[in-house]
From Swiss-Prot:
GO BP, sorted A to Z: carbohydrate metabolic process
Domain of life: Bacteria
Function: Catalyzes the cleavage of 5-oxoproline to form L-glutamate coupled to the hydrolysis of ATP to ADP and inorganic phosphate.
Keywords (A to Z) from UniProt: ATP-binding, Hydrolase, Nucleotide-binding
EC numbers, comma separated: 3.5.2.9
Family: Belongs to the LamB/PxpA family.
Cross-referenced InterPro entries: Glyco_hydro/deAcase_b/a-brl, LamB/YcsF/PxpA-like
GO molecular function: 5-oxoprolinase (ATP-hydrolyzing) activity; ATP binding
Ranges annotated as spanning the membrane: none
Protein name (record): 5-oxoprolinase subunit A
Length: 247
């Protein structure tokens, strides 16, 4: 049976966390520097444990004002300290809750910049490996970040998006554009099935680009996140595709 992971961003101050954890197989737990706090992180970890959902850390630039979505240029040593701080916090709360932090997925601008910047990708990979070499790194399918992570000996998870539109180079349409988001569940389902079954994703210029789909992301702060997750699970099941983090 074909398998796919379904992941969601949590502990970002949204009301959907508990509902989504009944529908997904992996949870990207906010580390407190773009949103959330220690209590929301703790609750998200416990809820994930209750639902047998795999837990990953979701670190960002220190940018609460812009939800971590603004590009920043930090000195390498400062950014490493920022990442160690965030990963250490989530790992400690996971340890205290009797669960394992299994992977890392950068957030927002950090994610998008590292997808194209080899130096930034290497800094992230080195930091993650220093925390725990068994951690996997989740990133945009086909991105430089995943290639660099593998060069550093890390296992990787190729991520695709149900609720984002794509450019011809395989990158995401910037959120500053009006056509960045997939706004209805019918389009999201069509895009997901094409990615999982055909290994391609439609682009905004009318073409298609090849991708590898290990994990599908839904944004927990999205207005349609719960609706998307329910439909996606149902449609995947009907196609004989198992939603699981065991990939």
């Amino acid at each position: 049976m074909k398998q796919i992971d379904l992941n969601v961003d949590l502990a970002e101050g949204c009301a959907n966390d508990q509902q989504l954890l009944q529908l997904v197989s992996s949870a990207n737990v906010c580390c407190g520097l773009h949103a959330g706090d220690y209590n929301e992180i703790r609750k998200a970890i416990l809820w994930a444990k209750e639902n047998d959902v795999r837990i990953g850390a979701h670190p960002s630039f220190p940018d609460r004002e812009n939800f971590g979505r603004t590009n920043m240029q930090l000195p390498d040593d400062e950014l490493k300290a920022c990442l160690f701080y965030q990963l250490g916090a989530v790992k400690a709360l996971c340890d205290a809750s009797g669960v394992t932090m299994e992977y890392v997925k950068p957030h927002g601008a950090l994610y998008n910049m590292a997808a194209k910047d080899p130096h930034l990708a290497a800094l992230i990979a080195e930091t993650v490996k220093s925390v725990d070499p068994s951690l996997k790194l989740m990133g945009l399918s086909g991105s430089i970040m995943l290639t660099v992570a593998e060069q550093h000996g890390l296992a990787t998870i190729s991520e695709v998006f149900a609720d984002r539109h794509y450019l011809a180079d395989g990158s995401l349409v910037p959120r500053t554009r009006d056509d960045a988001m997939v706004e209805n569940d019918e389009e999201a389902i069509s895009q997901v099935l094409q990615m999982v079954l055909e290994g391609t994703v439609p682009t905004v210029d009318g073409g298609n680009v090849a991708i590898k789909a290990d994990s599908i992301c839904l944004h927990g702060d999205g207005e349609h996140a719960v609706v998307f997750a329910k439909r996606i699970r149902r449609e995947l099941k009907e196609k004989g595709i198992l939603v699981t983090s065991s990939i």
